């Protein structure tokens, strides 16, 4: 009896830790993406579409990101509709859960966007090139850590990551290669939007290139240093050797 109670308490504690790491990861990721936009040097490829739309049409960045994520979820659902039986229903349920995740995540973006000033306009020492590069590096570190934490918990994926995984599975190619393809598509479409509606690129710059090159490295380094300990704390990996 006591053994069963201990097991239940351990499972409950692990579940709470798992959700705690997941939500903390989403917060850190939202902070990283927001800092990325505030540095004014180019944003991450996957959100370049929503950022360009928010600037060109003077819309809320978080709301535009929610629309973008909604499109990503609908694409995943359309692909999963071909699946039959219990597996198909399970995949569609996982897709549907990305909608409430998107609402919460984009509200985080809005809160951080209000609290953090744009460095291009604030007129402080941080608005110089060195200051903006420093904020960009901090943004990429936060983005990598947040993505690593939330993805490692294996709960509801961020719609961007979910789309990459679904497309990789559908076309039978590696996730890394598909991520590069999706990033390239987003960058090209953002450039076209900017040139057509603003007469110049919007949201694409050195920060975009740095995000492509460095965020994956940050994720790998975080997993190497903290991954095993975090997974054990979340109950996803045994502490035994």
Report each predicted region and the residues it spans:
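Extended, low-hydrophobicity, polar/charged segments
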Residues: 2-241
